[in-house]
Amino acid sequence: MSKSENLYHAARELIPGGVNSPVRAFTGVGGTPLFIERADGAYLYDVDGKAYIDYVGSWGPMVLGHNHPAIRNAVIEAASRGLSFGAPTEMEVKMAALVTELVPTMDMVRMVNSGTEATMSAIRLARGFTGRDKIIKFEGCYHGHADCLLVKAGSGALTLGQPNSPGVPADFAKHTLTCTYNDLASVRAAFEQYPQEIACIIVEPVAGNMNCIPPQPEFLPGLRALCDEFGALLIIDEVMTGFRVALAGAQAYYGVEPDLTCLGKIIGGGMPVGAFGGRREVMDALAPTGPVYQAGTLSGNPIAMAAGFACLNEVAQPGVHETLTELTNQLAQGLLDAARDAGIPLVVNNVGGMFGIFFTDAETVTCYQDVVKCDVERFKRFFHLMLEEGVYLAPSAFEAGFMSVAHSEEDIDNTIDAARRVFAKL
């Protein structure tokens, strides 16, 4: 047995499923998950000593690559002064100033510890601000594991085939209305059914938890218009897309202004951080200035703030997003060319530093129903054969892939060459 296999066997006796987040268990592809010893740049190194070109990037945060020296040094320096104070720090103020500078729609920001905390808190704030209970989300979109959001969810819930989680009371779920991504008619129908009851729409501007589904040109502006028409707030969940699709997020890339924005992943540079923010009048409703309660013992943790501040300063440097997009375009086109040459039907969606691979005869993949028709069994074989080639992709047909600026053109070429060999075996 490999060391990963031994560790997985031991972990399953101690941790549910042997992992601390379900998708890591390889449930979506079968086999034994890799146990990682270290990472550097574009590469992961497992406990058995094998190196992999990494396109998971810790599920998105590692836009600069692993173990970036600026982030590592910031963490070391901050840790030398203490790990947590439970009191405000100067770095919290600097971090808030940087985030609101980079994302102009955020007049104010509140730091939390995860993307789930960010979305959960933003929805509570929207409900408190509007005095309404119902929310709209989209089928196949994942916004964390808060009860109200585990209704027809994507990500690990979709991988496990459990889009409606047990443990969520029907009385909670009834306030969550689910519409079809990229379908404005379904959203209007929900508003017309409940014209005075919907507090907000929450949406991934690029749906990254049913693989990678970009919005149709009219979709996000249409959501903004519907929210304005019916007096609801628009929450854009940029936990995955923030600072990755563009410096100011997918909202800037697609030209839509939300009332509230949720951030995570990249904002922590690899540390556990989330944030939500937006219009001042909405944020003023948050405790302690307003009645909507939200709190956290470790929110604004000095180590996490230092890591995030260092990361965002690097991400904001000229050329970062141009490089990220060009590398992703090269990979996407190379995979398409390799698949075509092998006679394998394939769709690759990509935007900014995100991409999605779909084994399908369809010409496009634009919503949840398109995604679930794709050939999952072929993806499983593709995943394991690529892993044997030293390429680590997301271990689920329903998860996006992530590029970093640490990937080299040689890494991209090697990945495409590996895919050519694998397609020949499929």
Swiss-Prot record:
Keyword check for Isomerase: yes
The enzyme's E.C. designation: 5.4.3.8
GO biological process: protoporphyrinogen IX biosynthetic process
InterPro entries xrefs: 4pyrrol_synth_GluAld_NH2Trfase (IPR004639), Aminotrans_3 (IPR005814), Aminotrans_3_PPA_site (IPR049704), PyrdxlP-dep_Trfase (IPR015424), PyrdxlP-dep_Trfase_major (IPR015421), PyrdxlP-dep_Trfase_small (IPR015422)
SUPFAM superfamilies: PLP-dependent transferases
Location relative to the cell: Cytoplasm
Catalysed reaction equations from the record: (S)-4-amino-5-oxopentanoate = 5-aminolevulinate
Subcellular location, principal: cytoplasm
Modified residues (N6-(pyridoxal phosphate)lysine): K265
Enzyme class: isomerase
The keyword Iron appears for this protein: no
Span of the signal peptide: none
GO-annotated molecular function: glutamate-1-semialdehyde 2,1-aminomutase activity; pyridoxal phosphate binding; transaminase activity
Pfam family, any one: Aminotran_3
Keywords of the record: Cytoplasm, Isomerase, Porphyrin biosynthesis, Pyridoxal phosphate
NCBIfam families: hemL (TIGR00713), PRK00062.1 (NF000818)
Similarity field: Belongs to the class-III pyridoxal-phosphate-dependent aminotransferase family. HemL subfamily.
Oligomer and partners: Homodimer.
Protein name: Glutamate-1-semialdehyde 2,1-aminomutase
Provenance organism: Klebsiella pneumoniae subsp. pneumoniae (strain ATCC 700721 / MGH 78578)
